[in-house]
């Protein structure tokens, strides 16, 4: 995963009005923990989820967060469309940049 790709997501989150920080949680590290008014959102960014190992790395930390705030995995590969997993929303980069959450 290129740092530049995470920067694109970071800049878009700021543009959408979120306060953004890296999440060091008991569950592990989340790419971004975002706050806007009283809304909190967790975001992981990845290129492609092609293996179970990658899926566990990207979704696992979000699964271990024991609250009801929205959780997103933003992926960069334009060829992949996946269903939501355990309430975690799988969102393409293009869709995120055009529509946000």
Regions found by a protein language model. Give the residues of each.
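A cross-kingdom feature that marks ATP-driven nucleic-acid transaction machinery
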Residues: 1-101
């Amino acid at each position: 995963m290129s740092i530049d790709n995470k920067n694109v997501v970071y800049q878009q989150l700021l543009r959408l009005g979120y306060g953004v920080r890296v999440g060091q949680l008991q569950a592990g590290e989340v790419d971004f923990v975002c706050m806007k008014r009283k809304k909190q959102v967790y975001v992981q960014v990845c290129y492609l989820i092609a293996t179970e190992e990658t899926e566990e790395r990207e979704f696992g930390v979000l699964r271990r967060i024991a609250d009801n705030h929205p959780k997103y995995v933003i992926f960069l590969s334009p060829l992949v469309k996946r269903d939501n997993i355990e309430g975690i929303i799988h969102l393409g980069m293009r869709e995120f940049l055009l529509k946000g959450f």
